[in-house]
């Protein structure tokens, strides 16, 4: 079982409440969203992996927001392409 000291992660994020939000969001991305961990898994739980990523400075709230926006833009572009292809097929 991995032991994690969250003090370094708290210092990276700013306060423990925001740390909980960021770590939970990242753990959910890894577990459900199919995102690859940025650190070695070492048989750790998703929350521990998220905390280790935060401690190492690989994940912040801003980074998560940026990645979400990029994914949303890519999805919107794909949807526009699909709609355009359908519209051109009807002509």
Swiss-Prot record:
Keywords tagged on the record: DNA-directed RNA polymerase, Nucleotidyltransferase, Transcription, Transferase
SMART domains assigned: RNA_pol_Rpb6
UniProt-listed Enzyme Commission number(s): 2.7.7.6
Protein name, UniProt field: DNA-directed RNA polymerase subunit omega
UniProt xrefs under SUPFAM superfamilies: RPB6/omega subunit-like (SSF63562)
Record family assignment: Belongs to the RNA polymerase subunit omega family.
Gene Ontology terms, MF aspect: DNA binding; DNA-directed RNA polymerase activity
Quaternary structure note: The RNAP catalytic core consists of 2 alpha, 1 beta, 1 beta' and 1 omega subunit. When a sigma factor is associated with the core the holoenzyme is formed, which can initiate transcription.
Function: Promotes RNA polymerase assembly. Latches the N- and C-terminal regions of the beta' subunit thereby facilitating its interaction with the beta and alpha subunits.
Catalytic activities: RNA(n) + a ribonucleoside 5'-triphosphate = RNA(n+1) + diphosphate
Keyword Protease: no
Record-level GO BP terms: DNA-templated transcription
Superkingdom of origin: Bacteria
Cellular component GO terms held in the UniProt record: DNA-directed RNA polymerase complex
